[in-house]
Design a protein with these regions (language model features):
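A polyanion-binding, active-site-adjacent surface
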Residues: 2-171, 179-186, 191
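Short, flexible loop segments at boundaries between secondary-structure elements
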Residues: 188-217
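Intrinsically disordered, low-complexity terminal tails and inter-domain linkers enriched
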Residues: 218-235
Length: 236
């Protein structure tokens, strides 16, 4: 499994005119981002992917949020979960992960806390991603979120398509209808879990538990399949 082509597309994108969209892996705002912020987010993402090893479960959300992946570099994950106080961090947080924002308190995303709580905080085998893997913001500015327009999602499905080709055999679950529709456009039928935001936490937890308890067809990936190792992650 080689995610280098996926990361190259991710770091380069998005395609087309995309006003109100930040690619946090190559862009930074001086008033919001700390030193070498974009590089730090790339490094955070690649370190996380190494911890995933071989994905067996993929949770696909909509887009990066400003309290989460916009500054952490990882979907459904906040700075505080990576680089905050030890009691607030995920079990796999700490070094080499780092915060990239100028927020002294570090950003914390409620949805990310719910998702990782439902996953038991375990990164191994669990890949979190977004169908639009950058940060679209609204009229209130860069510290806001918006749903990416359908045309914008469609124009950038090549990133998701390449990712899915590399992780064939994993169970794919959509978090919300936008993610489900994007998967359907690629010919992938996936159940839509209730998004944990806006009161959906309990339903999300129950649906995730129910779906992961169901047997799935044997993966085509053999026990010798390459994991997401450092050599397979470099975006050249």
């Amino acid at each position: 499994m080689n995610l280098s082509p996926v990361l190259r597309l991710l770091y380069r994108g998005p395609r087309g005119a995309a006003p109100g969209v930040v690619n946090p892996y190559r862009e930074a705002f001086p008033e919001l981002d700390g030193p070498r912020a974009a590089q730090g987010r790339r490094e955070n993402l690649e370190a996380y992917l190494e911890r995933v090893e071989v994905p067996r479960l993929v949770l696909l959300g909509e887009a990066l949020g400003f309290r989460g992946g916009r500054f952490s570099g990882i979907a459904f994950t906040s700075e505080r979960q990576l680089a905050g106080p030890a009691e607030r961090r995920l079990p796999w947080g700490g070094s080499p992960f780092r915060a990239t924002s100028r927020n002294p308190a570090l950003w914390l995303e409620p949805s990310g806390s719910i998702v990782w709580g439902a996953l038991g905080g375990e990164a191994r085998g669990a890949l979190v991603w977004n169908v639009f893997p950058w940060h679209p913001y609204g009229a209130r500015g860069p510290l806001s979120n918006r749903t990416p327009e359908r045309g914008l999602v469609t124009a950038n499905l090549h990133v998701l398509e390449r990712l899915l080709a590399e992780i064939d055999g994993a169970r794919v679950l959509a978090v919300g209808r936008t993610a489900q529709a994007a998967l359907a456009a690629l010919g992938v039928a996936a159940p839509a879990l209730r998004h944990p935001a806006h009161g959906g936490a309990e339903v999300f937890r129950r649906q995730l538990r129910d779906w992961t308890a169901q047997p799935m067809r044997a993966s085509s990936r053999s026990s010798t399949s390459p994991s997401l190792s450092a050599s397979n992650l470099r975006a050249k």
